[in-house]
Amino acid sequence: MALSHLPVGAQAGLMDTPALTALLSQTSFGASLAPETRARLAALGRVIDLAKGHVVIHQGTPSRDLGLLVSGRIAMRLGLPGERDRTIQTLEAGDVFGWSTLLPSAIATSTGITLAPSRAILFEGSSLRTAIAIDSELATAIYHRLFASVARRLEPNRTV
């Protein structure tokens, strides 16, 4: 089930744009954004609190939200045919999840499960895609940070 539908174990935190902008500035993802860009991004977000063991995204299903982990931990697991799911990465505060929502197929490539009570900022996919289509500064900032995140996640898997 998509996070945008507030599944069992999730609570939406009501937060106005200035408060969400301040929260975003405390993350590694949002701290270096220009203040105006950070405010525009914050206007698209909402805060969600998640219980331990909550599935935030499920492999093979539509990815509807881009999430930014504010606190807690999320195990990203990959399901392989005939095998148990494997944890391929553990996300920490400042990491993003659900980036598939920005791709044309928007299908999740892994499953994310909270390892502890967690808080995240969610950006609904269609609203975010519309915003980056009309705001090149916002698009550049988001894509730059997403590519950096992907590169960080791939680094431990490099073999020489």
Region spans (language model):
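Cytosolic regulatory regions built on CNB/CRP/Popeye-like sensor folds
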Residues: 1-160
